[in-house]
Swiss-Prot record:
One of its GO terms (cellular component) is DNA-directed RNA polymerase complex. One of its GO terms (molecular function) is DNA binding. It comes from Oceanobacillus iheyensis (strain DSM 14371 / CIP 107618 / JCM 11309 / KCTC 3954 / HTE831). The keyword Transcription applies. This is DNA-directed RNA polymerase subunit beta'. Keywords: DNA-directed RNA polymerase, Magnesium, Metal-binding, Nucleotidyltransferase, Transcription, Transferase, Zinc.
Amino acid sequence: MLDVNNFEYMKIGLASPEKIRSWSYGEVKKPETINYRTLKPEKDGLFCERIFGPQKDWECHCGKYKRVRYKGVVCDRCGVEVTKAKVRRERMGHIELAAPVSHIWYFKGIPSRMGLVLDMSPRALEEVIYFAAYIVTDPGSTPLEKKQLLSEKEFRSYYDKYGNTFKAQMGAEAIRKLLQDIDLEKEVDALREELKSAQGQRRTRAIKRLEVMEAFRNSGNESSWMILDVLPVIPPEIRPMVQLDGGRFATSDLNDLYRRVINRNNRLKRLLDLGAPSIIVQNEKRMLQEAVDALIDNGRRGRPVTGPGNRPLKSLSHMLKGKQGRFRQNLLGKRVDYSGRSVIVVGPHLKMYQCGLPREMALELFKPFIMKELVSRGLAHNIKSAKRKIERVHPDVWDVLEDVIKEHPVLLNRAPTLHRLGIQAFEPTLVDGRAIRLHPLVCTAYNADFDGDQMAVHVPLGAEAQAEARILMLAAQNILNPKDGKPVVTPSQDMVLGNYYLTLERENAIGEGSYFKDTNEALIAYQTGYAHLHTRVAVQASSLNNKTFTEEQNNKLLLTTVGKLIFNEILPDSFPYINEPTQLNLEEKTPENYFVDPGTSIKEEIQSRELVKPFKKGFLGDIIAEVFKRFQITETSKMLDRMKDLGFSYSTKAGMTVGISDIVVLAEKQGILDEAQTKVDKVLKQFRRGLITEEERYDRVIAIWSEAKDVIQDKLMGSLSNRNPIFMMSDSGARGNASNFTQLAGMRGLMADPAGKIIEIPIKSSFREGLTVMEYFISTHGARKGLADTALKTADSGYLTRRLVDVAQDVIIREDDCGTDRGLTVSALEEGSEVIEPLIDRLIGRTSFENVKHPETGEVIVEKNELISEDQAKTIVESGIQEVIIRSAFTCNTKHGVCQKCYGRNLATGSDVEVGEAVGIIAAQSIGEPGTQLTMRTFHTGGVAGDDITQGLPRIQELFEARNPKGQAVITEIDGTVLEFKEVKDKQEIVVQGEVEQRSYAVPYNARMKVSIGDTVEAGQELTEGSVDPKELLQIKGVEGVQDYLLKEVQRVYRMQGVEIGDKHVEVMVRQMLRKIRVVSSGDTEVLPGSLLELHQFKEANHKVLMEEGEPATGRPVLLGITKASLETDSFLSAASFQETTRVLTDAAIKGKRDELLGLKENVIIGKLVPAGTGMPQYRNLESGLDMPESAEESSEEETQTV
C-alpha cells in the first residue's frame, strides 16, 4: 500500500486510449447487471466478477474454489480470481466504442478547448459532432478549404462534382482527424508572431488559443485524446446495486447511464456488421455520442436524461460537484468513528479543564481501551470475552473505565464551528444521566447555552493525538481569543451578577466602621450577622500578606468592604489588592487614599467618603487579562474557577428577583410625549403649507420621536435606585441594557416595517402598561424581521467564512525571517475626526521594522526587529510619536506563507508565533466568526443618495469580493487643487487642476461633496461621499494604497459594531487578494501575455531572463475577490473542491497540472498529514523532543519510550 505521507505531488492529465485499457481488467460487453433469480452478477455485464473480482472474499463465481488457501487462483470454470472482495472497489473495466465520441468537458466547457485548438466556433463543432454537417478534412485538389462546413445538400453536390478527390467527414471521427493533423510547434510559433501585431478581439482570442496550445505542447497530452475510443467503467462498488426489503433493487444512476451507452454501442456494432445504410449508422452514432455525454455530464447539453419521476440522473460530473459531491461530502467532511453526541447541561462544579461524560457514552467510546485493560488485568481471558463483558455491563467494567479515562482527554465540538475555539479538549469525569456536562466559562467560546444545545464528543486515539489535545487544545490553555488577544473566558450572567453584588458598597450598612484584625475575623462577623457584605470596614493591612503593599502601608489600616475582602481572596498573592475598578488599581497598586493611620476615627472617615463603584463585567475581563499577563495559563485558569464559584455562590445568596414593582413608572412621561406630539403637529403644518418636502417631514418626525425616547430613557435611568434588581442586572453587564429597560418602563419607541423602513407612528406604551392592539401589531413586524434576518445572516456569514478559509488556507508561518527590505507605516486609523483604531492597538504584538527613538531624548524605545510589548507601545504613544514603521504580512517576502517576524505575536497565546502555525485559517476564522454579529441591512435614510452606504455584513462581502461598491465615490487621479464646480446639462463636474494637466470629474446632482473650491487633493482622494472602488484605487495609488484602504474599511465596519479584530488577520486576507500579477508583455520570457502569475513565479521568470541579459516581462498587479482568488490558486485540488469543479478539472487536465500539496485542503483530500503545526516536515520525525548526544542514546533507551 502506498504511504500517503511520502507523496511529493499529484498530477492530473488526459488519459490516452492505451492508458484506459491498461487500467482495465476486462471489457464490459453486456448491459446486464445481476441475474434476478440467482442475484449473482451476469458474465461480461456491469457487475461481472471475472472483470471486477469476486463478490465474497476468497470465493469464485461458480463456487469451485472457496477459502483463503486458494488465494490468487483463477478458476478454470468461471474465470474469476480468488481474492478479497474489496478489489471490487478498485478494479476498473472498459467499453470498446464502435465509433469515436467527443468528451463533453473539452467540447462544451467555456471556453471550448476543442474549439480553441481547431480555431472553430463551438457552434460549428456541435454541428459536426452531432452529425448535422460535414467538415472538410482534406480538400485535395478542390477549391474547398480545410475545416469548411458543408450541409448534406452541399456535400452531395460537391461529391457529384469532384468525386473522391476530397474528403469530408462527420462526427467525432472527423474532429479527431483534424486534431491529429495539427502541428503544435508550428501553431504556437504562428500565434506568438500574431500576438506581436494583433489588437482587440483578435489579440484576446490569440492569447486564449496560445494558452491551450502551450498547455498541450508542455504537458505531453495529445489533443486527439479529447476524443474517446475507449470508455473506462468505474469499479462496481462505487456504483452499487443493493436489494431493498421488498425485493426491489436500488441502484446508482451511473448504472443506468452505462447501460444506455452499452446498448447503443452494441446496436451500432451490429448495424456496422450488417452494413446498414449510412443514415441509420449516423443516427446510431449520434445517439451513442449523446449517451456518453449524459454519462460524463448529464444536462450539460440539451435536456438531461431522466429516471423515474422525471428526476435527472446523476452523472460522473455530479458525483464530484457541490456540497454532496465526492470532494466536500467524503474527502473534506468525513464522518469519524469513536464519536458521540448528546445534549449539554451546565456543570458548575467542574474545573476549567474538565467535562462530564455520561457513563454509558464513555463505555462505548472507550470500548477498545477497556477491552485491552480487562485482558491485561486478567479479568477476561481474551478480547472476545472482554467484549462480551462490556456488552453485558459487568460491574468490573466500571472500575476499569474509571482508570482508562484518567489522563485521556476528549474533544468537545459544538456546531457550527465558527473558529478554532469551537473544538476544545477536556479531561472527562464520569457523570450519571445521559447529558454531557459543560464548564460554564467555556460557553462564550462555543457560543453555547443550555436550552437544548447538543455537542459532539471525539476521542483522540494515538499518543501524538492525545499529546496535542492535552498541550494545545485543553480548554484551560485557550483563554485568549485568537481574533483580538482578549480573554474569551470572561464570566457572564449569574457569575457577573454574583461578583457585582459581592463588591457593592452601601451607606449605613450594619456594622459600618468596624475594625477587623484580618479577613477571617471579618468573615466571622459577616456569618454571625454583625456585618454585611456591603459594609464598609477597616482591616489591618499587614494581615492581608499582599506583596504589593509597602512597608508603610502595611502599618496602616485598609478601608474596604467585607465583600471585597472575600473577592480578593481569589487573586494571587503578588497581585494588587483590588479596591476600586480602575486601571491604576489593577496594573500598579492599591490607591494610597484607602490607607489610614491607626487611631483615625474609622466611622467618620468612611462616612465622609463617596461610595466606590462595584466591579462590572468589563472590569472582571480586565482582571483576567492582567492575571494572564503576569502569571500565564495555569494560575489564570485556577483563578477563573475561583471567580466562577464565587459568582455562583453570591448570586445565590443575593437572591436577585424581578417583580412587577421593580419596574418604576415615570411620572413625567406623558408630558414628554405631549410635547413631542405638539412638535410633530407643527412639522405636519409646515408640510401642508408646502414649506418642507415629504422626505424632510418624514425625517423630522422620526427625529422628534427618537429624541423623546432618549429623554425618557435618560430620566428613567436617573430615577432608578442603584439597589433595583433590574438596574443591577443591567449595570453589572449580566443581562439587559438601558434600551430593554426603557421598553419595560418607558416607551417602546419607533419600529421598522418589513422593508426595514421606520414606521413614523411610535409605540408610546411600555410593556409595564401594556400595548394597544394597533401597537402590538406594529411591533410584530420588527420581531419577525429580526428572526428572518438572523437566519439569513447565519447562512451568509457561514459562506463568507468558507470563502475566506479557502483563499487563505495555505498561508502558514514557513520561516523565521524573510529578510524583507520594506515595512508598513502605521498610524491611528481615523475617519474624519473619529478614531476607528488607536495607534497603540496597531503596535502591540508587532515587530518593529527599524529602531523607534524617543523624539525628545533620542533614546531607543524599541530595537529593530523587536516585538513591541504593551509597555513599549504605551511609551511610544506617550512620547508623542504619530507613526511607526512595522513589519507586516503586506510586505513579507516568504513564498506560500508569511514569516515569523512579519506576523508578530500569536494573539491566541500572547507569545511569538511559531513556525508551522496556520495563520491563514486563523485569520479567516477571526474575520468570519464575528460575521453573525454584524447587521444585515443597508441603512436607508429617506433616500439621500450619499447616505445609502452599505454597512455590516454586505459591506464586508463587498470589500473581500472586490466588487464595485454601492454608492461609489468619485476619486481624483492626480494631485492638485479643486478649481471649480461646473454645471453641465443634467449633472455637475468637479475640476481638479494638477501641476501639468487639468481633469474634470462628472458627479451626480444628489451626491454630497467632500471637498470645497481651493482644497488641495492627493491622487486617490475622495471628492464625494461614498465608498471607493478598490480596483480603481489600485490603478491610481498602487498596491500599498489599496492595502491601506481595505484594511481601514474592514476595521471600520467591525469597530462600528463593537467587534475588535487584530490588523494582522485582515492583512493576511488582503495579501491573498493581491498575490497575482497580470502579464502585459512577455519580453524574452516563456510566460504568456494576459496570463495570471503568482508574484514569485513572475519574479523568478524575469530573474532567469535578466541573468541571460534578455528583456524581462512586464505585468501589473491585480486585485482578485476572494472567490476568484480561491479558484486561481495553483492547487487544482483545492480549487476543484471549492467551486466550479468541472471547469477547474478540465483546465488542470489539459495543462497536465501538478499539485505540489502546499496548502491544508489538498493534503486533507489525499489523506496526508497537513503541512502545518506538528505536520511540518521539519517536525515530522521528532520522536521525543529531546536532543540527546549520541553516546547517551543506548543508555537511555527505556526513558525515550516513556516520553
